[in-house]
C-alpha cells in the first residue's frame, strides 16, 4: 500500500459509504450468496482501479446497485 491515499467509496448519488486504502480490498456480495474480493487502487479523488478495471467511483456504485451487488471493506 502506498503513501496514505484513500479511496472514498460512495453510492451512485455520491453519498460516502466507506473508504479503503490504496491497495485495499473490498468484498462484493452477490444476491445468490457468493462473494468476491477485489483489490482497489487509487487513481484520483473520483477514480479507482477495482479488480484491474478503471472506474469513476460513482459509475462503479451505479453498476453495483443495478446488479444488486453489495460491497464493503474486507
Regions found by a protein language model. Give the residues of each.
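Residue-level detector of beta-strand face positions
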Residues: 8, 25-27, 47
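Intrinsically disordered, low-complexity, charged/polar segments
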Residues: 53-74
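Short coil-to-beta transition motif at edge beta-strands of beta-rich domains
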Residues: 18-31
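Mixed-charge, Lys/Arg-rich low-complexity intrinsically disordered regions
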Residues: 1-19
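Short beta-strand-centered aromatic/proline hotspots
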Residues: 35-44
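Glycine-centered tight beta-turn/hairpin loop motif at sheet-sheet or coil-to-beta transitions
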Residues: 12-13, 31-33, 52
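Short, solvent-exposed secondary-structure boundary/capping segments
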Residues: 46-53
Amino acid at each position: 500500500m502506498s503513501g496514505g491515499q484513500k479511496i472514498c467509496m460512495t453510492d451512485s448519488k455520491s453519498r460516502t459509504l466507506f473508504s479503503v486504502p490504496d491497495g485495499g480490498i473490498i468484498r462484493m456480495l452477490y444476491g445468490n450468496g457468493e462473494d468476491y474480493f477485489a483489490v482497489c487502487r487509487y487513481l484520483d479523488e473520483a477514480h479507482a482501479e477495482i479488480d484491474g478495471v478503471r472506474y469513476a467511483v460513482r459509475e462503479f456504485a451505479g453498476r453495483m446497485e443495478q446488479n444488486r451487488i453489495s460491497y464493503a471493506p474486507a
